[in-house]
Design a protein with these regions (language model features):
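Conserved loop->alpha-helix
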Residues: 1-211
Length: 211
């Protein structure tokens, strides 16, 4: 589990295919510069969130680590297939402070940035998500975007999906990869765990589910 509070901005330095050059079904190995993330207590097999996706550390050295990413994960996430900056967070420990909200690191789907611009001292971010994700979004609810715990500012259901907006304070823009966003960019989305369980409980108690 994670909190959605980014601990460091690292960088994917190398993307190495795990199979032969002609095998398109294999995954890749990512070599990630830690960007100042403290790796002293990270063991092989531990989890680190990279752009909101939970990955298992399979190699570690001074200032960097490596993870293997399956082709399936690559097809359903953004920002993991080429070198670039990435948000990093180590897995939550029992005694850690929960500064954001409970985040599993399992990406539910991709969203598309429709608007990203300064508004006063902050930035307004608008994202178009699928209806399947949109049904879990609520005003002042939580959502994870590229591994960052954020608060939903508005929700607008549209024929082509659900557009929601977020207000980003200057600190969040400065210390995460969200500062690189622009219209058309794809982002990793994870819905709030509580919203997921509430939806399941409501569907399980419906007359159709009971019959």
């Amino acid at each position: 589990m994670f909190t959605g509070i980014v601990a460091a901005v690292g960088r994917i330095e190398a993307v190495t295919p795990l199979g032969s050059a002609t095998d398109t079904d294999t995954g890749v190995r990512l070599t990630v510069a830690s960007g100042g993330l403290d790796l002293a207590d990270v063991e092989l097999g531990d989890s680190i969130s990279i752009q909101g996706a939970c990955m298992t550390v399979i190699e570690k050295s001074a200032g960097s680590f490596a993870v293997d990413v399956s082709r399936e994960s690559l097809s359903k996430t953004a920002g993991l297939s080429e070198p670039g900056d990435v948000n990093l967070e180590k897995a939550l420990r029992a005694h850690d402070r929960l500064g954001g909200h409970l985040v599993s690191g399992h990406v539910d789907g991709l969203g598309e940035v429709t608007h990203f611009a300064p508004v006063g001292e902050s930035h307004e971010l608008r994202i178009l998500a699928s209806r399947d994700i949109g049904k879990y979004l609520a005003y002042k609810g939580s959502v994870t975007v590229n591994g960052v715990s954020l608060t939903v500012n508005s929700v607008n259901d549209r024929p082509d999906g659900c557009e929601f907006s977020i207000n980003l304070i200057p600190h969040t823009v400065q210390v995460t990869t969200l500062r690189h966003l622009k219209a058309g960019a794809k982002v990793n989305l994870e819905i709030d765990l509580i919203a997921r369980y509430v939806e399941r409980m409501l569907s399980a108690t419906s007359p159709i589910a009971r019959n």
